Design a protein with these regions (language model features):
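Acidic, Ser/Thr/Gly/Pro-rich intrinsically disordered interaction regions
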Residues: 1-56, 60, 64-171
């Protein structure tokens, strides 16, 4: 694929990040098909790398959304290398047209919320493997479901905030 085939590579990083998530999930499925088990000696390292990459892209998808929110709502005082949901919530809450979005981000960031779960998953993967013989987690269906939840979260926010939409924003 070349850049002209994929115009969203330049214009919509949220869609690109979701595309990357789907590719990493597809790679995990292919590893399982090829080796029969993600825990096998030959598959384990590849599977771990793809899982870590998938988790990073999931967090990156939300980060891209946060960058767009900062840009489109013209939030000032938030450093691009220190983007945190609480700072964005504070900036949005100060604008009359950002209160509803601030509430959605607040809910997502609370314990058990969608963004909190993505961060918790990443934090867990920093200290341990999601792949283990003891774990009852079947990672492929889990990540399929998590990716659906991520898409729904992004779509819900973009659909309800026209200022965040792009011509490519068909999630």
């Amino acid at each position: 694929m070349t850049a002209p085939d994929l115009p969203f590579l330049q214009s919509d990083r949220i869609i690109f990040k979701l595309f990357a998530c789907q590719e990493h999930l597809k790679n995990i499925k292919n590893i399982k098909l090829e080796h029969g088990d993600l825990l096998s000696k030959d598959a384990r390292v590849k599977a771990e790398m793809e899982i870590d990459s998938l988790i990073s892209q999931m967090i990156g998808t939300v980060d891209s959304l946060l960058f767009r929110i900062i840009d489109r709502f013209q939030l000032t005082g938030i450093q691009s290398d220190r983007i945190e949901i609480p700072a964005i919530i504070s900036g949005l809450s100060a604008q009359s047209n950002g209160i509803e979005l601030a509430k959605k981000l607040q809910d997502a960031n609370l314990l058990g919320g969608s963004y909190w779960r993505f961060k918790d998953l990443r934090n867990y993967s920093l200290s341990g493997s999601l792949l283990s013989a003891e774990a009852s987690l079947d990672v492929i269906p889990y990540f399929e479901q998590t990716l659906v939840q991520l898409k729904e979260f992004i779509k819900n926010i973009i659909t309800n905030e026209p200022i965040l939409q792009t011509k490519e924003s068909q999630i």
